[in-house]
Structures are given as C-alpha cells and as structure tokens.
UniProtKB/Swiss-Prot annotation:
UniProt name for this protein: Regulator of telomere elongation helicase 1 homolog
One of the GO biological process terms: DNA recombination
Places the protein is found: Nucleus
Function (record text): A probable ATP-dependent DNA helicase implicated in DNA repair and the maintenance of genomic stability. Acts as an anti-recombinase to counteract toxic recombination and limit crossover during meiosis. Regulates meiotic recombination and crossover homeostasis by physically dissociating strand invasion events and thereby promotes noncrossover repair by meiotic synthesis dependent strand annealing (SDSA) as well as disassembly of D loop recombination intermediates.
HAMAP family membership: RTEL1 (MF_03065)
NCBIfam families named in the record: rad3
One example GO MF annotation: DNA polymerase binding
Similarity comment: family membership: Belongs to the helicase family. RAD3/XPD subfamily.
Amino acid sequence: MPESIIAGIPVHFPFEPYEVQRAFMEKVIMCLRDGTNGVLESPTGTGKTLSLLCSSLAWIRTRQSEHQINMQKLQMEQQQRQATGGSATGAISDLALTMGKANNWGVPKVIYASRTHSQLTQAMRELKRTAYASMRSVVLGSRDQLCIHPDVMKEQGNSNKVNMCKLKVHAKTCSFQLRVESKKDHPDFRGPSIMDIEDLVKVGQRLKMCPYYASKELVSSADITFMPYNYLLDPKARKANKIELSNTIVILDEAHNIEKICEESASVQIRSSDVAMAIEDVTHIMKIFTSADSQDSGGPEEPKDFTLDDLTLLKEMLLELEKAIDGVVVENQVEGTTYPAAHIYELLGKANFTYGNCATIVALLDKLVQYLMVASQHSMLRKGGSFMVLSDLLNVVFANKEDIMAKVHRSFKVHVQIEDTKQTKPAGNSNSKQTGWLGKGNNATSTVSKTAKIINFWCFNPGFGMEQLLNTQVRSVILTSGTLAPLKPLIAELAIPVAQHLENPHIVDQSQVYVKIIGTGPDREQLISNYKNRDNPKYISSLGQTILNVSRIVPDGLLVFFPSYPMLNQCVDAWQASGLWADLSSRKPIFLEPRGKDQFTSTMEEFYQAIRDSKGACFMAVCRGKVSEGLDFADRNGRAVIITGLPFPPLKDPKVILKRRYLETNRTKENQLLSGQEWYNLDATRAVNQAIGRVIRHRHDYGAILLCDARFQDASQVQQLSKWIRGHLGARPQSSPFGPIVRELRQFFKHAEQTMVQPDERVVEPPLQIVCKEEQPTLTPSYNSNTQIKREPGSGVNKFQLASELAAKAEMANSIKSWTPADYVNAAGCTNQSQTAPNAMDFMSRLNSNVTSIDFNNTDLVKIHKRERSSPTANESLTSGKKRFKLISSTDMVKTEPGTSNSCSYGNTSSSGSDSRCCSAKPAEYPLKEAPESRADFLREVRSVVDSDKFRSFGKALLAYKTGGDNCFEVLMVLLLDVLGAPKLRYLLHGMRRYLKNEHKEEFDIRLASLQAS
C-alpha cells in the first residue's frame, strides 16, 4: 500500500490520501504524540474511520519499533555494565529518564469505541482492508451476543443472562467456560485474522469454548480493542471487563451524542414498586431459611453466602426506604417535583444506606441475585430483578466521592414523579397474613400503593463521565464524528482540555450536492413544523404535496425525516384520509421506520431490495431514530433527503426543563457553556445534521438536501448546521419559490446522471433471504419488480444472529467500499459467509410460511406500515393497471411455469461433497463445476446466470416448497429444470440438493441419476 509521511510518521493508506484525510490523520497523530486530547469533525463519507485506524495504528507501530530499539539498547548497556563490574539498574534509570513521563514507558494501546456493535463491525471490516490488518485486535461484546450456552441463551433479558452465566461459572457447571484455559491458544482463536462478534461466536462453537470469556483473554495482548461506549464510560463495566486505561489511547467515534451518553451513565432511577418487590423477594428467601422442610422446598441446596441476620437487616433497611419514599411530597401530580441532589442522600440515609456500608450491601444483593437465579429454576420465584435495580442505584449514587459533593449538588437533581401501578396480588398469597419478619411489614399493600413514586437521580453535567475517564490516566482522548459542530460548546460541556480540533470540509464538489430551503409548498402554504402549525390541515396537505412533487423528480431512493413519531403518524393518517397516500405510493413504494428492533432489520433489507426497481423507493423515518443515526444510504439508496421540520426536544419534559435550568445557572464567561435556549436549538440541529449525513457517503456520490421548514432561514439555525452544508446555502440563506426549485432539482439530477459515474447494480440477496416469523401471518413478495414487502424477523432465530449479524448485513449490503478508487463505483457485496456447507433447512428457514401482500393504492391498509404490520385481509379485487400485492394461499402460490411440465427431464452433475450421493454420469458437454457452498454465494450465482423472470420464479418455488407438502416438491423440480436445466447450469441444479428437506433427497437423487443416464 502507498506510504505517506504524516506528522513525521509513515502511514500506509490503501491509496493516496485526499487532503481532508491527511489533515485528519495529522491531527490524530499530533494528539497521540503529545499525549493530548482532540475533537475532530469530518463529514460522513470522507473516510473518517479509515483515517482514524491507519493514523493511530501507524503511530503505535512506530512506537513499537522505537520500544524494541530501546530495549535492545538497554540489554547492550546492561551487558556492558556487568562486564565492567557496574550496576545494571543504572541503565534502567537512565533509559526511563530519556523516555520522558512514566506513563510513556510502555507502548500505548488503542481502544476504539462506538455506539453500536454494527458500527464496530464496520470499523473492523475497514481494518481488514489496511496494511495494519496483522496487528492484534479484539472486540468485546455482551453475554447476550457472545454466550453459546443453551441454558443461558433461553433466558429472557440481558440481566437474567448475565446472572445465569455468573451462576454457572461460579458453580463450575459451564463446560464452555471451563475449556477457555485449554483452548485459548488454539490457532483458530489466536490466528492472524481479525475476528468480529460473529467470527468469535463461530470459533467458539467450533472449539466448544466460551466466546465471551475467551475474548477477554485477548485484551491484554491486543494492540487495538473495539468496544461499545458503555463498556468504556461505565466504571462498573470497566471493572467487570478488566479494562485497563492507563497509558491508553481512547477513540470515541460517532461521538455526536457523547454528552447524553455521559449524563445517562451517571443517572439512575428507582420505583416504589422496585422496593416493594425487593421486600417480597427478601421475605421469600427468609421463608426458605426458616422452613422446616427447606431441603425439599425446591430451593438451592448448596451452602448460602449470607445469613438470616443479613436478610433481617436488609429487610429492615428496605422497609425504612419504602417508608422514606412514601413520605416524599409530590406537589405537582402531573409533572412531578424536583429536589436538590442532596435529597437522594437524605432519602437513603433514613434507611441507613451510606458511603460506609454501600460496598457491603451491593455484595449482599449480588449474592441474593445468584441465589434466586438457582431457586427460580425450581419454583415460581422471581430472579432478583429488584435487587439489581437497588444495586444500580447504590453504585451510581455513591460513585461520587464525598469530597466532590459541592460539584454533585450543582450537577445533579432529584426528580420525583407519581408511578402508575397495576393492582396485583402479592406473591406468596397464602402466607400474606403472616406477621413479624416473615410478613410484609406495616405497609403490606405497598405494591399497589396509590402514592407509589418514581425517584429519578439525573445528571446534567457530562463532564462527570469524562472526568472519570481522564482520571484513569489515559494518554489521549479523541472524539470524532461527522456532526460535532459547533465545537466550543461541546468542549465546554465535556470540560476536558483539548489541544487539537478540526472541522473538515466535505470531499465532494459543489456540483454533487443540491441544498435548498423550501419555505412554502406548491400551494404557497408556509411550511413550518412548529407546535402551533402541526395540527393545521393545510400545512400537512402542503407538506404531502411537496413530497409528492419531489418524488416525481428524485430517482431511486428518497429519504423523508420527520421531527417525531407522532408527527409522522399524524401526517400518514391525514394523507391516507385525503387520498394523497395513494398518489405517493404510486410514485414510489413507501417504507415507514418501525419502532421495534425486531422489525427494523427486515424493513431495511426490503427497502434496499425495492431500490432495485426502476421507480426506487421512499423511506419515511424520524430524526434521532435508527435510520438517521447509523445507516448508510449511498448512491441509489439515497439520492435525496427531505427534512420536514426541526426535532426540538419536548419543551415541557422535566428533564429538558432541568437541563436548560442547569445551563443557565452554571453558565459563565469563563466556561463558555451554552444558554438554555442555545442548547435547546442545538439539540434539534444536531439531529438534523445526522439525518442529512445519511445521503452523501463517498467521493463520487451525489444527492439533494431539501430543508422543508421556513425556520431554516434563521441565522441562528443556519450557523448550527454542519460547515459543509452552510457552504451550499450561501452567506444569507433564503427559501426559494417552489416552482424554480422543482426546475433546478430536475436539472441537477439530469446533469448528475450525465456527468457522474453511475454505480453498478448493487449485489443484494433476494427477499427470500429475510428471516420471518413462523407463527404469524407475514408480508411476503409475489416477486413482482413493482411490489414492496414487509416482514418481521423470526423468533426462532438465534438472537445474536438477529440483532448483530442481520443488522450488520443490512448496513453492509448497502455500504460502499469507500476510498478504494478501483472500487469506488462498485457497491460492496454481502459479508463473507461461512465456508461450511449450510444445513439444509438453514436455507429454507429464511422463507416465509404465508404469502400476503399490500395494495399501496388502498389507503385503508396504511396502518400496516404505520404500526405492527399485521397482515391485511384479502377481499379486494385486483386490477392489472395498479401496483399492488396479491393475497395468495401457500398451495396456490406456485404454478408450473408456461412451457414446463411434470414429465420434463432433469439435469445433474456429480459432486464430491460428502452429503451427495454418487450417480453414474454421462460425459458432460461443459466442464464440471462445483456449486458455491455458501447460501448467499449460491443465490448470487443463480441470479447471475439466469434472467430476472426465471429468478423470480425460482424464488416463488422455493417459498412454496418451504411451506407446502410433497406436491410442492414436484413443482419445485419442474421449476428447477426450467431454470437450471441447461447443461452448463447443472452444477447448480446438483448443488440444490443440500437445501432440500431430508425426505426429498432420495427422490431427488433418483431423478438426477435417471436424467444423467438418458
């Protein structure tokens, strides 16, 4: 790879770096060299991740070389001094002085942190493309993602999995964890390849070794460790994962939300119901202790790590805490009441929770959780969730040392709200009348108390989290994102010394981006999404007409971002009622961002698939949602983004009110904090900047940015937009009449299509790859290029695969191999699949059991996209003139294609795979080939060798075969012959065997043998 000297360090970059990349890498290296901190902004699409990795690892590699030279020098001096009878320790002292600060003695390590594991996976894929791929790396994940023990994985919720895992490890009953010591040096695990979460799980399954604990074995020797934010910023998580930060380089990527993350990591909440359940749980354990037949009660039989006296004392403290919470006065029953930070210490002090006994009580609570995890396997006991809530409260509240209480009082507030409780019977009802320590105490109905409360301990100073980070003696902290500006308020809030800062311009030319403020719609109605105007029918109609007119011009993908889910739903309802929705969906199939994580991945894959159609697709989402924060809509996936309004936080939200009040109270000329109103405006604009960043993703990308709110003309709003966007708006941004904008927009895309290099068709797995629920009717395509589909992921799929592998696949299927000139215009393929031959039903398990569809011309069905996407009923007649989905029963779904019959012959080639049965074969006309073993590669090859109509038929037949009986196998065989029957394609026909149901393989072999002999 080309080598560039940047800030005196040789950096190997995949190609000659652009100027913005050189500037970025220079700032990174200066931070590392000087041991200082940096805040660096570089727009999305400028190769920020690649620049971060190459510059930091180049500096590390240089330091490693220097360290090796110094150690050799030390050894030589030791030998010389010993030869002359001198002391060897003097050489060590001299060398330590020459190397400067004590924390410079060793070679620093890099911690690369980002918000999500899918972002970390993308970063690791970037690392694989560099000259530094051989450097040692590891990624840290949660048990939820890495655990392969079946008993742990069947637990619901991450906290239950954590405690079940701890229990099995403590009891030495997890065979996977016990193998870590013997398998941790296995070549498959210690090999040179970079392993992400998915790779760790696969290696762990192959070696029958715990990936979670095995990954920790790599941390001490890793040059770079990838982890999510919470592992880094949460002191408890750092301790649990044994993360050593001294002399470490900390890179916080996607740091535009770092203030909120720091505040949330220092905040905590407890409810009256949590305390009441903790009392019940302690009571249950005490009953087990005192029961005469406790050995037969189904409870755990091993010796306890606590005594009845411990339980008695804890219950007394909990009862006092419950009493103290009940005594808190809430003057405003709707919005709640705010108290100073000292109130939380007074509240806990009444129950004797103090700095002195906090650690002891937390240790006891952890033991009780472990105890209940065992007991819950034999009875209906809860699993100690209330103890975990109390433990979190104590850990957060007492993490702030007594000597900084003045700062705590300035930065924290206690906000008390009324808790809505449900009338439920207390657990252990048969003994509810008991008194004394086995009873519920004086307040026996506390679970259903009408005055149950929520105690919030909120932090409003993100500097707390960053200060804890800096106190660990890190070498450098580098914050970077595409949307950090304005930098001064960010630096002021985080309260860290920053020596290097950067606001990079974008790498694209002016001609590649069209940015306009649209202040009025086609009907000249003002477009302004403020609180007063949001219910205005004229505004909603005008906004819809604006989107409709833009959708007629924008090719391929169109993104529309709303300020909130309620606003999105309100517009959809209005457009549905007026008929505008039908007009919109006739131009482009419309996808709505789902709130649920399970539906999100499948929706994204369906959108990417719909982009392949000539009409493209429209995705409507919300600012601050999953789509706006982390996904890539490069090239055809996103040619324009419409921002329908400014996503201000809820004005009357107690947390927003208190944050604004905190800033106003603590703002001085010296600290340069924002005013409350400035923060409020900036919070909205940063969300807009993130949404805008979804579109222009690389050097040769192009697109339009349309700001459909008249308030974007305000100078205060414009100044908070990213620097590269401001450059397109000019010195005095003004909204333009709608007519000229339409003409300019049409001309922009016409010119771009003529002058810009157009990307090749993306390689995307067909819709039949989507994971679907088996037990619910779902939405599946009838394989018409004009249809749009929605499906939900299946509950039977491994959760890691659902949450991590599929999320990464949705993003990576859309990503571009950025910054490699030869590949710039080619879309990236899907991630490499395992080379192991897939299980037969693994292929078919991704096909849906029922086929239903959406008619986008029928506005009554819009709620399918809007909420849970329940399947519609099939009572509409179908017309050929409109784009719609058909409701098709699984038995009628696949019909023999014209020109085929059940009497057709079948083609085959022999295979050497162990799964195949050998057949006598005639000499082939074409050289024998082997079908790809990977399911994804197999489908891509089929798609590449047959026309689109046959591939759709192929998909329909596979779907029907998955859900149907033996008759569907007959239909599938006819279809396979039609699609893959040509002599040169018979290797693919033979490769289909591994994906058939076991009961059909023998018949398949007989027919292939018969064909080959004919």
